[in-house]
């Protein structure tokens, strides 16, 4: 059942046989690491997860500084347990920019960067409709949060905030 599972995973996204072969290759490597000769379904599932994590890590490494700062703000707002709307995330972003001594972009531009991160599969966000009160975008999750955070904090431009606790970047608002 291993090869059909690899084929199914490969077909899920784009129907690409190369993806299936890549999953099978990584599953084989994982099998070797556990000193076995038989690739099992769990190896295939772990391989798929590893490939996804590696893809996200590569994307995060190549992001420009402003996008990395927006991603870090997304991680911090989710970690805080506060309402993870774009407007709340923007407040965290502004504090991060001040700590990093980088220019603060407009909320509209930060929303655009958030949409780009969503399209790249680095974050997951949804649009919430609130009737006559309009709509707002909410950040639901960050793919490979711990790996992404580790990569972000290794970036030399993010060094000034490495030792600062997350709580320092979460504003104290009345509505929070």
Task: Give the positions of each predicted feature.
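Amphipathic alpha-helical transducer elements in NTP-driven molecular machines
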Residues: 3-4, 17, 21-24, 41, ...
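Active-site catalytic microenvironments for nucleophilic, acid-base chemistry
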Residues: 26, 30, 76-77, 92, ...
């Amino acid at each position: 059942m291993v090869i059909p599972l690899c084929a199914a995973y490969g077909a899920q996204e784009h129907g690409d046989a190369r993806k299936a072969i890549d999953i099978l290759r990584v599953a084989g490597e994982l099998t070797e690491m556990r000193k076995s000769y038989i690739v099992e379904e769990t190896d295939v599932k772990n391989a798929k997860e590893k490939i996804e994590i590696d893809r996200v890590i590569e994307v995060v490494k190549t992001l420009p500084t402003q996008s990395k700062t927006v991603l870090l703000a997304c991680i911090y707002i989710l970690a805080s347990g506060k309402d993870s709307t774009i407007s709340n995330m923007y407040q965290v972003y502004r504090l991060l920019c001040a700590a990093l001594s980088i220019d603060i972009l407009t909320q509209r531009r930060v929303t655009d960067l958030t949409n780009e991160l969503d399209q790249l599969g680095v974050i997951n966000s949804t649009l919430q409709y609130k009737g006559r009160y309009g709509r707002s975008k909410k950040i639901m999750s960050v793919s490979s949060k711990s790996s992404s955070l580790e990569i972000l904090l290794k970036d030399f431009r993010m060094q000034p905030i490495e030792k600062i606790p997350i709580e320092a970047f979460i504003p104290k608002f009345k509505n929070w």
